[in-house]
Amino acid sequence: MEKMSHDPIAADIGTQVSDNALHGVTAGSTALTSVTGLVPAGADEVSAQAATAFTSEGIQLLASNASAQDQLHRAGEAVQDVARTYSQIDDGAAGVFAE
């Protein structure tokens, strides 16, 4: 039978993943201002269409990024939960053996 173990550093890794995801959301929010505030290069119709297309594509990309960051945040929280559960079980088992 193979011994199961877990490294307590997993909780720190989960926290870092969650923090990185939150930074990604913040960066996306900052980028939204630049993407939606693009002014057409000229007064012609092509420039207006290009600016509109850029804005539309940028908004879609940022929405995709926000979704990905949300999934990363959830994954980080899941790793933290698993690490917490392992620690609680290990502490409980250690208490039984200490008695």
UniProtKB/Swiss-Prot annotation:
Presence of the UniProt keyword Secreted in the record: yes
Domain PE positions: 1-90
Disulfide bonds: none
Predominant location: secreted
Family annotation (Pfam families): PE
Domain of life assignment: Bacteria
Cellular compartment(s): Secreted; Cell surface
GO cellular component: cell surface; extracellular region
Annotated Gene3D superfamilies: HP0062-like domain
Cleavable signal peptide: none
Function of the molecule: Plays a major role in RD1-associated pathogenesis, and may contribute to the establishment and maintenance of M.tuberculosis infection. Together with PPE68, stimulates the secretion of IL-10 and MCP-1 from human macrophages, via the interaction with human Toll-like receptor 2 (TLR2).
Miscellaneous comment as given in the Swiss-Prot or TrEMBL entry: Could be used for serodiagnosis of both pulmonary and extra-pulmonary tuberculosis.
Stated family: Belongs to the mycobacterial PE family.
Record's protein name: PE family immunomodulator PE35
Native organism: Mycobacterium tuberculosis (strain ATCC 25618 / H37Rv)
